[in-house]
């Protein structure tokens, strides 16, 4: 059995776990600090909050872009990213694995997630809002990759691809 849980990424001089939008999430702990004031916090199970709501709330409270990744059994990751100007967007890492999860409920990947190319375009804009200049092609490659072996590794590869780590 793999990892199930959330990674929450935002920039703040204060600990993310102490912000108004995260205080009510029990078990939220610091996973790592990235460059500048960027932080990754982790919740090892599904919190009682929607990821897009959390990403938007973090973006609004910090005034900076925010990103939430929900890891599903180390197979795939739902990415919810937001900024206060453009709202939220949803994509995934390890799309074949995600499609399998959705198919179990009779759903299709394209009904919920951006394509890897669309996700990469959104990620470039998101990264630009963080002050980083990144290229579409390497990000599209990350969004197309399958977990090998752990999807959470792809999540941190995405953060590096957006010049956060």
Tell me what each language-model feature is:
Residues 20-22, 70, 101:
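Generic alpha-helix signal with a bias toward terminal, lower-confidence helices
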Residues 1-35:
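Short, extreme N-terminal segment that most often corresponds to the first beta-strand
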Residues 25-97:
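Short, intrinsically disordered low-complexity segments
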Residues 8, 22, 29, 62, ...:
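Residue-identity detector for threonine
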Residues 97-165:
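Long, compositionally biased intrinsically disordered terminal regions
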């Amino acid at each position: 059995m793999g990892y199930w849980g959330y990674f929450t990424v935002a920039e703040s001089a204060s600990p993310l776990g102490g912000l108004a939008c995260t205080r009510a999430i029990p078990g939220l702990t610091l996973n790592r600090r990235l460059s500048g004031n960027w932080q990754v916090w982790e919740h090892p199970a599904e919190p009682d909050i929607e990821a897009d709501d959390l990403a938007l709330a973090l973006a609004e409270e910090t005034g900076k872009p925010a990103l939430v990744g929900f890891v599903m059994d180390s197979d795939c990751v739902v990415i919810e990213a937001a900024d206060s100007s453009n709202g939220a967007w949803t994509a995934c890492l390890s799309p074949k694995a995600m499609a399998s999860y959705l198919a179990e409920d009779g759903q299709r990947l394209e009904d919920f997630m951006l394509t890897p190319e669309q996700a990469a375009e959104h990620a470039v804009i998101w990264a630009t809002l963080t002050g980083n200049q990144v290229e579409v092609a390497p990000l599209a490659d990350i969004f197309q990759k399958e977990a090998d072996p752990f999807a959470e590794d792809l999540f941190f590869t995405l953060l590096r691809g957006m010049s956060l780590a």
